[in-house]
């Protein structure tokens, strides 16, 4: 995490086990990752300081565009003007920081709650909600509007397999619970739509949004989104689809061979027996999916397995 300078509040991808790259993003400094340790540790002071530092991460978007290498709409950042960021990895990281500050009743909790409320309202007002993919954020008024690619809010469609695997489901579900009856109108429905349609059929996606989402991945990870939708809508059909995504799509399979491979020579400093087929991404997303699926739709598991 960068603690000073123009990139303060952003994280750098990799940079621990091997060389870093030019990805400087909020998804890497995501406060949600630190939240659980903070509480389990009884309020670790250093983590508390870091959570406070990350409250101003929204200001960095006027200096550095995290999507600069793949952006096609011509937008470039400028300090003190509206800034573009994604509704997945970027907004979820900013929202997590604001949510934690509100939750902790920190010195800026009212500001944080207002930023959260305003941006939630902005997402709800987008024609396609989270499916829009990104938006323009005003760091002065703390409001969120349509993205540069769709200034008239006609209904942009931009879905990434990464949007919901960096804390977004956890942050959104907590925010909805915290706001309760005060949640801005339309936001829960916008989230339910994303949860349902991410792995709906191409025909369903096209009927709802005019186009399909194309080829996606991380369906096991996203099974927890379908599980959330099934729970909220009390829909057993969606629940069974969620379990199918969990057991029979990608990620860790129940019948996978749990073998190790001996690695030595110039590949490692010390010889080691390694599960080379096991990826940390799969393990992390599998764990989250297990926890959330069982919390939301455990009553339908026997029906799926039978």
Predicted feature descriptions by range:
Residues 1-305:
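Catalytic cores of extracellular degradative/oxidative enzymes
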